[in-house]
Structures are given as structure tokens and as C-alpha cells.
């Protein structure tokens, strides 16, 4: 078993400011431990006080309040440099022949590290995981050769996920192009082909909102499991029970991102067993159209006029059901389904493979502590 070492013996804090304003790439940091373009309003802000981060340096946010069970920490590996908020702590590994930054970042991805950081955060108004606490973290530091092997295994899995994500995006774009070619391009809504008509979403979709059920965090804690628990935009949790089993489309009901910057509704195409709370409408195609058709058609819709509420934007069921869509003939729909179902079969295979690979990554992270 590898001996545990004190992290502070391998890292040092870095505090370089953007005095010459040469670095303009402003990044934020998420609890998913990834850097992302900052959405902060920087008009009139003195960017010379921001901290500079170089490739292979790490950044963390000491304030762990309001971030759930995770700590925001990341390794800059996709950019040569960037700038971050003055509130962030920048640090680096002092000797890459003793500890690889990539290996260290793998340790930070472990849920055990998040629990450790939350437990060792202090403060009343704000909970802080300070620099001294970070330095006191104990971790196994195997030989540099073994570290490289572990990192290589993890990055092989990460690269496979990346390739699958590219394939998923390509398949979805292909399905959307097929939809547009069949039902949008060169189609005159005032003079539709024989057997086609304009109808409403409520006519062609089965809404299953009556089956959904919200569960509070306290209600979910004793029933943790493998089934996804979905909210308006994504998976919120995993529990040991499910309501739905099959292929469905979730249509975001409320929240700040109920529509995107182009006015399109927030959608989630799902299959398998899962639970949904009351922040997303649950739809399926009926005997007229397929669920895949609904997905492609609704991605084209501008739903801006359907949103109500200022403090809490919302698209209620009545407004959603009023969306007007082209309803093609059965022959055209059958032909479309034959082609699009093949596309989505590959889409599902790639997505499910990513889930399995993610499980392998979790196992690899777990083995680091053994």
C-alpha cells in the first residue's frame, strides 16, 4: 500500500496579477471541477487585479457555502493561460517529477475529497476551506511511473467519452437535418402537402405530468440508488425508485433557463427507468407522431411568447400544449420514423457507453485510496 503524504509538501500558492492586461481569457470554475467561460459582467471592472493562471496550475474556491456537497477546484489543461477572480486561490505542484498535476486532480475528483473539504470548512456566515486545510490533505503519492500509468488509464477513458460525445452531437445534428429536410425545407405552411395539417402539441403528445412527483433532499437521502432523478434541466440526484420506464421527452416547466438565448425550450430526451420532479413536463408521442419527432420539432420552436412570470419564468401546460406544429401524413411519419429510429439507436448506444465508462472512471478514482 502506498504511503500517504501531506499535500502541502508538494504544492505552493501562486499570486500573479494581470498587471499588463495581456491575458484576456476570463474563466470561472464549476462544482463539476471544470473551467468555463465567465458570465460575470466585467464592464468597468479593473481586470489588472485578476489572477493569472498558467497551464498545469490549479485553482480552487475556498468559499464552500451554497455549493452543495462539492468543492469547486480545477486544473487548467485546455488553455495556455487565463485569468480568474481575485477570490480564487491559484496554486501549483512544485516538482512534476514527484507529483503529477493530473494525478492530483484525479484525487480532487474523488467524492471522498469533497466530503473531507466540506467537513473541514469553517465559518458561520460563510464556510471556508482555507489554504492551510488544503495543505493538510493527506494523499497516496506512488512513484512517478505509477502516477503516469494511473493518469494514462483515466485519460484513455476520458478521451473515449469525448469521442462518444462528438458522435452524439453528430447523430443529433443528422436527425435534426433529416427533420428539416422532411418537414421544414421547401414546405409552404399555407399550402401543405396532401394529408398534412397544422395542429397543436396537445393533439399529438401525451402529457404525463400527473405521474411526476417532487421529492425534497431529505426525502431522497434514505432512498439513494441507481435511477436518475430529473429536474428542469438535468439529473439532480439518483434514487432507488422510478416512476417512468420507456422513451420520453422532458420539456422544462420553470426556472431561469426555461428557454435558451434563441427562445427554444429546454428539452431532455430520455429513455430507461427514472423519476421526474415537478419542474419539467413529461411528454410522449401518441399514435400520430413519435417522441423523436416531438424532440426534433420542438427544438425548432420559439417559445418566448409562452413564458410567464418575471421572478420565476414558467411555461405552463396550457401554453405548452398550444404550440403549433406541422402534423404530416401517416406515410411520411412512418418513413421519417424508420430513418430517425436508426439514428437514435446509435445515439442511445453511445450515451449508454459513456455511462459505463463514467462508472469505470469512478472505480479508478476509488482505487487510488486503496
Predicted regions and their residues:
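A short beta-sheet element
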Residues: 55, 59-109, 231-233, 242-299, ...
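Short, solvent-exposed loop/turn elements at beta->coil junctions and helix N-caps
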Residues: 76-77, 123-124, 189, 217-219, ...
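Well-ordered mid-protein domain cores that form the structural environment of catalytic cofactors
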Residues: 105-114, 118-119, 138-140, 302
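Non-catalytic DNA-recognition/assembly elements of restriction-modification systems
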Residues: 1-18, 136, 140-215, 219-231, ...
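Sequence-specific dsDNA recognition surfaces
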Residues: 4-60, 202-250, 255-277, 282
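His/acidic/aromatic-lined binding-pocket segments of jelly-roll/cupin-type domains
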Residues: 49-51, 57-58, 296, 340-347
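A short glycine-rich beta-alpha junction/loop motif
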Residues: 82-87, 122-151, 273-278, 309-334
Amino acid at each position: 500500500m502506498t504511503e500517504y503524504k501531506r499535500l502541502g509538501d508538494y504544492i505552493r500558492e501562486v499570486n500573479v496579477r494581470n498587471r499588463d492586461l495581456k491575458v484576456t481569457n476570463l474563466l470561472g470554475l464549476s462544482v463539476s471541477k471544470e473551467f468555463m467561460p465567465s458570465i460575470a459582467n466585467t464592464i468597468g471592472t479593473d481586470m489588472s487585479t485578476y489572477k493569472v493562471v498558467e497551464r498545469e496550475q490549479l485553482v480552487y474556491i475556498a468559499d464552500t457555502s451554497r455549493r452543495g456537497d462539492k468543492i469547486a477546484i480545477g486544473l487548467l489543461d485546455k488553455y495556455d493561460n487565463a485569468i480568474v477572480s481575485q477570490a480564487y486561490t491559484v496554486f501549483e505542484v512544485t516538482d512534476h517529477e514527484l507529483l503529477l498535476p493530473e494525478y492530483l486532480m484525479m484525487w480532487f475528483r474523488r467524492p471522498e475529497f469533497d466530503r473531507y473539504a466540506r467537513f473541514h470548512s469553517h465559518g458561520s456566515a460563510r464556510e471556508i476551506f482555507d489554504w492551510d486545510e488544503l495543505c493538510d490533505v493527506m494523499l497516496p503519492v506512488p512513484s512517478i511511473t505509477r502516477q503516469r500509468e494511473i493518469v494514462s488509464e483515466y485519460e484513455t477513458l476520458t478521451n473515449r467519452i469525448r469521442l462518444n460525445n462528438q458522435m452524439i452531437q453528430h447523430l443529433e445534428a443528422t436527425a435534426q437535418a433529416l427533420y428539416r429536410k422532411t418537414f421544414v425545407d421547401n414546405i409552404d405552411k399555407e399550402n401543405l402537402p396532401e394529408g398534412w395539417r397544422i395542429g397543436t402539441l396537445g393533439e399529438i403528445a401525451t402529457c404525463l405530468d400527473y405521474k411526476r412527483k417532487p421529492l425534497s433532499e431529505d426525502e431522497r437521502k434514505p432512498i439513494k440508488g441507481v435511477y436518475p432523478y430529473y429536474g428542469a434541466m438535468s439529473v439532480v440526484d439518483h434514487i432507488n425508485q422510478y416512476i417512468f420506464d420507456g422513451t420520453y421527452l422532458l420539456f422544462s416547466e420553470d426556472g431561469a433557463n426555461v428557454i435558451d438565448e434563441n427562445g427554444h425550450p429546454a428539452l431532455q430526451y430520455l429513455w430507461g427507468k427514472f423519476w421526474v420532479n415537478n419542474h419539467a413536463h413529461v411528454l410522449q408521442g401518441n399514435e400520430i407522431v413519435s417522441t423523436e419527432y416531438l424532440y426534433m420539432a420542438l427544438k425548432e420552436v420559439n417559445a418566448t411568447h409562452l413564458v410567464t412570470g418575471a421572478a420565476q419564468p414558467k411555461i405552463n401546460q396550457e401554453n405548452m400544449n398550444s404550440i403549433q406544429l406541422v402534423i404530416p401524413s401517416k406515410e411520411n411519419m412512418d418513413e421519417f420514423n424508420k430513418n430517425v429510429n436508426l439514428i437514435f439507436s446509435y445515439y442511445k448506444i453511445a450515451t449508454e457507453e459513456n455511462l459505463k465508462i463514467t462508472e469505470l472512471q469512478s472505480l479508478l478514482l476509488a482505487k487510488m485510496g486503496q
